[in-house]
């Protein structure tokens, strides 16, 4: 008889408990309750999708949002759009809704669809969100408005961003706000309006208006800015003052009282020097705000050596120098007045541009530069919508320099290659024009075909069709020959390119050939002069060629710039109307002259 033994309860439960414990250990890590969806993705889309598919509810939405962000980061926009549509059907928290909107907006931002971005990105003001999300929101909207050239609206978003920004970010935002306001004209600024609750934005606008309206009086501008900042110490502009405003506040405003004019009044360049001197004195005598005690010392640079000139500057207590004119003397200026043992530090406006311009806060440069004019022509042609320019210039180093200047500027705006041709002997002019327009090649191809086929073909040479604008650097006598040759070289059924010319063609003499339709550049004094200035100049100098007027205008602008250069150095984008153009400076203090353009009428 089999004896059955009873098993005790403790002995039965022990292996069961062990099995449960082992099962718990093998079930893997516990899923998190939530994911910080404001962070940047660190995994692939697939990894985030695996985690999303193994969860549910709000946590699944978190993983789907991270998968969406990973897809956008990898530029997988189709995948991202599918995930965005999937999320649109879910119940999202405020933080998730914000991140979903930011994801949609990021796709539009990457594709340059700024208007669409602004429509999609609209947080509710009552949402309780982390600061980082509000910062992303306002910054993305600011960038979108910037892309739409709506700088004021961009500033509105940047001011809102400032509520959540760190000190370092505040400083950067302040500079950006100030730069945006700098893109507006005085008239545009005064027409901008803020809302009643936009005190910070309104403060920035007030400062910008002051900077524009008082830019012609740096002393008054400095005093006004100092007073406003002291009255508004808690405004971001007072705490995180942009560098441009700091430069104005730190400026020691001293108007030159003893000016020296250095020119070669004898020798080869004497005629040009005397015309510049006459223009300078003309402007000085017409300056109603001139200090009666101010002095002018005119020094002939051919009558004294560098050491003698330096000593005269010291003896006369000169505090500003205009000149010299000759390039080699301009290069000596750095060593003569560099503030070292070689000489005193005296601010100067040189009347030529050396080959190698070195940044120097004390020396600026003004010249009637053909290279500057050619570069400006390239910019003008592009802004007018022309895509395939041809430049015609004289053979030799001068023509090569202006062509290179045109090319260099054109490359800033377009990858299209500039066609270039050089002309020389007038007897070869028609052949040169035919070659550049492809007429010679066309004739050769026709001749080859006739030779091969041994029959006379009824055809005519075809000119190239890829040139839509021609810029010509030529004298008026050369231009009168070039224009008809171009017209003959163009096929009757092709659209003729627009012809532009430099000021070199505007001699002021009588024109006996038809130059109708040619658009040319020149200084404002010759294209759009002030009638009162013209009348007074005609009274003083009855007969003046255009070249003589340009040199006098250079002297007039040299005088004007003595008072304007301090503003130009500290106010970005500052410009002033002059007789040789709209004047501004670049980073090397080379004066840039924006010329005027006009079209020649019929004879």
UniProtKB/Swiss-Prot annotation:
<dbReference type="InterPro" id="IPR011990">
    <property type="entry name" value="TPR-like_helical_dom_sf"/>
</dbReference>
<feature type="signal peptide">
    <location>
        <begin position="1"/>
        <end position="24"/>
    </location>
</feature>
<dbReference type="GO" id="GO:0008360">
    <property type="term" value="P:regulation of cell shape"/>
</dbReference>
<comment type="subunit">
    <text>Interacts with PBP1a.</text>
</comment>
<dbReference type="GO" id="GO:0031241">
    <property type="term" value="C:periplasmic side of cell outer membrane"/>
</dbReference>
<comment type="function">
    <text>Regulator of peptidoglycan synthesis that is essential for the function of penicillin-binding protein 1A (PBP1a).</text>
</comment>
<keyword id="KW-0573">Peptidoglycan synthesis</keyword>
<protein>
    <recommendedName>
        <fullName>Penicillin-binding protein activator LpoA</fullName>
    </recommendedName>
</protein>
<keyword id="KW-0133">Cell shape</keyword>
<dbReference type="GO" id="GO:0030234">
    <property type="term" value="F:enzyme regulator activity"/>
</dbReference>
<feature type="lipid moiety-binding region" description="S-diacylglycerol cysteine">
    <location>
        <position position="25"/>
    </location>
</feature>
<keyword id="KW-0472">Membrane</keyword>
<keyword id="KW-0998">Cell outer membrane</keyword>
<keyword id="KW-0449">Lipoprotein</keyword>
<comment type="similarity">
    <text>Belongs to the LpoA family.</text>
</comment>
<keyword id="KW-0564">Palmitate</keyword>
<dbReference type="Pfam" id="PF04348">
    <property type="entry name" value="LppC"/>
</dbReference>
<keyword id="KW-0732">Signal</keyword>
<dbReference type="InterPro" id="IPR028082">
    <property type="entry name" value="Peripla_BP_I"/>
</dbReference>
<feature type="lipid moiety-binding region" description="N-palmitoyl cysteine">
    <location>
        <position position="25"/>
    </location>
</feature>
<dbReference type="GO" id="GO:0009252">
    <property type="term" value="P:peptidoglycan biosynthetic process"/>
</dbReference>
<dbReference type="InterPro" id="IPR007443">
    <property type="entry name" value="LpoA"/>
</dbReference>
